[in-house]
């Protein structure tokens, strides 16, 4: 009986630590590639462009077929500036990103 009690205490402690580390995990920042030319069809060329821009990964967006680069955020909850020239372009990019995230969640 004492063994099962110790095992249960260990299991609960392990689960609490696992959950605590998951909550503190860094979020991922993303930005459109500045060097990738044209439409993004396959991942390898996009990833190569993103690695050359000092990102850790790159993937093609599903709707707009743009190369999106990813890396761990330095500041939690803050997105990397995409270099948009005007407010209308930023709003369009944000709307497309939100739509894409919503579609990926479903």
UniProtKB/Swiss-Prot annotation:
It is found in: Secreted; Vacuole. One of its GO terms (cellular component) is extracellular region. Keywords: Antimicrobial, Disulfide bond, Fungicide, Plant defense, Secreted, Signal, Stress response, Vacuole. Disulfide bonds join 29-73, 40-60, 46-67, 50-69. It comes from the Eukaryota. Residues 1-25 form the signal peptide. It holds the Pfam family Gamma-thionin. Transmembrane segments: none annotated. Gene3D superfamilies: Knottin, scorpion toxin-like (3.30.30.10). Induction: By salt stress. Its main location: secreted. One of its GO terms (biological process) is defense response to fungus. PANTHER family: DEFENSIN-LIKE PROTEIN (PTHR33147:SF128), DEFENSIN-LIKE PROTEIN 1 (PTHR33147). Belongs to the DEFL family. This is Defensin-like protein 1.
